[in-house]
Amino acid sequence: MSAERLVYVMGPSGAGKDSLLAYARKHVREPRIAFAHRYITRKSDGHENHVELTRDEFAARAQLGFFALEWSSHGFRYGVGVEIDAWLAAGSVVVVSGSRAHLPAALERYPQMCVVHIDAAPHVLAERLATRGRETADEIRARLARSVRWAVPDGIALTAIDNSGTLDDAGRVLVALLEGLARS
């Protein structure tokens, strides 16, 4: 398995991670790049690549070992299926949408993975979160406070993408990174 071909994309809420991943899915030309969907115990809003599961369904799949990666965040459960291991073994570059808090556990399973941090200026994050309409003003402030406290673990090579500007600008950076990994 080529764990260095696993691309773990993470970032604070409102950074535009899902928009960038959708942009990359649309614009990559390399067929060996695969985008993993997540399994999440919340309703799909149509803006991210995920399969909605009930808490019981999620727990059953976790117990059966169906997840390569799993974590809890904001009262929900998130998982990435073990199918990514087969995709990696077949030589694909596999892109997953992860969590900053879960990064240490993900690195235990995939120590050579490529870590990508998507971020945006604080005022951009606040504006996007308010527009999204999922949280109250207090919840948005709490999310922004968490993003300030996050730090890169020691020894981790990190690719940072600033998504404060246009989606095309940040999207081209992500697409170039993925296509470069696929060619290597």
UniProtKB/Swiss-Prot annotation:
Gene3D superfamilies to which the protein is assigned, alphabetical: P-loop containing nucleotide triphosphate hydrolases
InterPro entries referenced in this protein's UniProt entry, alphabetically: GK/Ca_channel_bsu, P-loop_NTPase, PhnN
Lineage: superkingdom: Bacteria
Pathway terms, separated by semicolons: Metabolic intermediate biosynthesis; 5-phospho-alpha-D-ribose 1-diphosphate biosynthesis; 5-phospho-alpha-D-ribose 1-diphosphate from D-ribose 5-phosphate (route II): step 3/3
Pfam families (alphabetical): AAA_18
Residue numbers binding ATP: 11-18
Keywords on record: ATP-binding, Nucleotide-binding, Transferase
One MF term in the entry's GO annotations: ATP binding
HAMAP family for the chain: PhnN
Family under the similarity heading: Belongs to the ribose 1,5-bisphosphokinase family.
Protein name (record): Ribose 1,5-bisphosphate phosphokinase PhnN
Species of the source: Burkholderia mallei (strain SAVP1)
Upper classification of the organism: Bacteria, Pseudomonadati, Pseudomonadota, Betaproteobacteria, Burkholderiales
Protein encoded by which gene: phnN
